[in-house]
């Protein structure tokens, strides 16, 4: 997720009046916030990363890693501690919520963004091999990105287990996300011959095939094991 943010949201960060980025729910250790700050500093030297946790003990434990003003930590949740960040990163934060509560959290987080700001919300496995995230602007979701270590998957459909809360229960017949994942698996299967050159080339070929068949996908970062699809192509169709 961090590499994608650095590459795809560099323009958002560079144009921000206040280059504040929030790492929401960084966890038991501040590693993700530390790494995010280091990566984003290469995009904009005056970036400020604020790690937020609702657990005061986690905030206290992170303090030795603080490097103000570049990296700070505070207690806070979906209200973003009253800040107006240009970018919010929320990884593995909403999985424990039900779909309705997660939708409310999206609304709260989007309302707290600075003008032109974005929210990146999603999940990944413990080893960072499989992940999915949604890019949201103040007006709503814009895209869904699938990411993996291509050597770790047998088919792209495995990423369904990492879908964000808004979609994870929608991977059923009649829903757009189900159709997209079926098409992705079919494109992967059709690219079997390319696997001679490695799984990365097979992933690239599958993404290219999806684009050619009319799916609104961005294949710019397929060489990195990522594929982004417009939210309109996968958004929920049926009432929860």
Predicted stretch roles:
Residues 84-103:
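A short SAM/SAH-binding and catalytic strip from SAM-dependent methyltransferases
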Residues 1-19, 23, 28-30:
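Class I SAM-dependent methyltransferase Rossmann-like catalytic core
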Residues 132-202:
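A conserved mid-domain beta-alpha-beta active-site/ligand-binding segment of alpha/beta enzyme cores
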Residues 70-72, 86, 117:
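Short, conserved active-site loop motifs that form the nucleotide-linked donor/cofactor pocket
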Residues 113-128:
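Conserved beta-strand signature within the Rossmann-like core of class I S-adenosyl-L-methionine
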Residues 176-240:
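Conserved Class I S-adenosyl-L-methionine
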Residues 27-80:
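Class I SAM-dependent methyltransferase SAM/SAH-binding core
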Residues 95, 103-115:
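A short glycine-rich, Lys/Arg-flanked "PGG" loop and its adjoining helix->strand segment in the class I
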